[in-house]
Amino acid sequence: MDIYAQTISSSESKVQRIAVSGNKFVNEAGQTIQFKGYSSSDPDKLVYNGKWNQAYFDEMKAWGANLVRFPIHPAAWRKHGKNAYQSLLDQGVAYAKNAGMYVIIDWHSIGNLKSELFQAENYETTKKETFEFWRAMAIRYKDNPTVAFFELYNEPTVYNGQLGTCTWAEWKALNEEMITIIRAHGCKAIPLVAGFNWAYDLTPVKDNPINATGVAYVSHPYPQKREKPWEDKWTADWGFVADKYPVILTEIGFCGADDIGAHIPVISDESYGDAMMAYCKKTGISYVAWVFDMNWAPRMFSDWNYTPSRQGKYWKAAMNR
């Protein structure tokens, strides 16, 4: 039976653990779960805005979500320090549970972890810091099934060589190292692995998948990554992976060319949403829309009364169908 996750309720004391079964996510009853949700902005920003609270998560739930993604920028992690930031995450995990949603913890860096060259200052990290982050997350949340997913690295890219070189084999080994560290601490959160081209391209998985069981793959197929018609290109670039492994699109979204914050690769219209929803329905792929915020783009709403933006209107309706 294919269902959207409805397994968390504030009235329930037990949250069902999510696991990988073949190419599906399943709950403890063996039911297939297709996840749908939104990425928050960085908890650090939401604290600054005074919005890191239950009302924010309840609003997200009302917009049709059963999953929320926390993008944790390395610079924000260092700014607060491990203990203070973990306290923020504890709050967010509790808010998500109360609202009936699962959580993705996302190490939100962009660049080349091998060379330790990154696209901007707030994405700066090191292999050591990244490994230590996942060790801390594994220890903290190994017994908390609300934290269903660990997105190991947001958007890997060598930026056409500007950030150095990294082969798939080298990137695969780094991910396998993180998975080893996480699982050695008894943590059952599902590792999410991205490919190059800013987490778009999963073609190397066909011949050289991650050497670990219970893993899922991610793509960020924004509209301008490929020209219309998208569907066959999506299948060739990342969709084929869903024949063997679970896939979750941890960033999708769009805005008009004249909308606030419009930038490549997100400029499009509702036809992108229609194509993506049809594709996910056909394949069972899960998805997360970027971003549940009024400032970061493409934004979901235009004010803190949660007045939907153009894409906000679209995803709110789509996820509540």
Model-derived segments and spans:
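Short beta-to-alpha linker loops that shape the active-site pocket of alpha/beta-hydrolase fold enzymes
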Residues: 71-74, 108-109, 153, 253, ...
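N-terminal carbohydrate-binding accessory modules
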Residues: 4-67, 196, 317-318
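Residues embedded in well-ordered beta-strands within globular domains across many folds
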Residues: 37-39, 69, 151, 192, ...
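Feature marks short, surface-exposed loop/turn motifs that line or immediately flank catalytic pockets
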Residues: 42-44, 74-78, 111-113, 156, ...
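Acidic/histidine-rich helix-loop elements
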Residues: 29, 33-55, 77-81, 118-122, ...
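Aromatic-lined substrate-binding rim segments of carbohydrate-active enzymes
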Residues: 52-114, 129, 171-186, 265-285
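Extracellular glycoside hydrolase catalytic/binding regions
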Residues: 17, 49, 121, 128-149, ...
